[in-house]
Amino acid sequence: MPTRRSIFAWMTCTAIITLIASSAPADEAAKITHSFLVTGGETFIVDAEGKTTWSYPKSTRDGWVLPNGNILLTLSKANDGGSVVEVTRDGKVVFEFKGTQSEVNTAQALENGNIMLTEAGAKPRLLEVTRDGKIVVDVPLQAQTKDHHLQTRMARKLANGNYLVPQLLDKVVREYQPDGKIVWEVATPNWPFTAIRLDNGNTLINCTIGNLTIEVDKQGETVWKISNDDFPSKPFDDACGGQRLPNGNTVITAYHASSGKTKLFEVTRDKQIVWTYTDQRKAGIHHFQILDTNGKAIEGRPLR
């Protein structure tokens, strides 16, 4: 019959083995990898090992890897008025729309086949154009005109058919109907760059030189906020692009960060940094698209 001492020894040994077995997978799970598209002073795709697998010779502001493998890019000041191009992996241009004002700063491929873009200039506007270049939607934007460059950034078409537009110098994010009527807006503490409408109806906003990210509810109340005050490492350095991942984490750019500095970082809801990206390029990352996590492709509509 087992003695009390032998039973205690068996239980202790079992507990130690269980602890070792359970901690090993946790350590392995802690390692996060991503592949992603980068837009900015340099344009490229990085794999999970940090190697460049594709690049484009021009600077860009916004971009998407499309389901067909092509890349949609915004060339801010190309052709004098900016442009949007879709290119194949070997650099062939299969679509181009040339802007008519000062800059084109954002673009989005829509489910109906159209391309949405914004023009900055004396008459700031949001457009939808067909693949043959015909303008089918023209939304005038109520934005300041003193500084064309600081009018708008990452505008996105929403599932309800409206458009969410961050207006930098105006310090406001507005939701426009196709007829130009503003149906929702929220003032921001600093220049808003990225505004992402989440599935729960909240809106995630990166505030560039304010070095903070906020999430607001439908009433415009802040329900989540992170800034350099939350991190000893002070990772925020011009929070431009952002993306909410399926696991609830948020990836944020540090656009002013140059070579050797943290250019992207991923934070959890409870404000833990779980992944960072650094490279030796001088150019900062303006925006990005996370393509996969630990080899698994991001499914559904990218929240960026």
What are these regions (language model features)?
Residues M1-R5:
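N-terminal secretory signal peptides that target proteins for export/translocation
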Residues D27-R304:
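Histidine-/acidic-rich catalytic cores in large beta-rich domains
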Residues A9-A21:
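Bacterial N-terminal signal peptides
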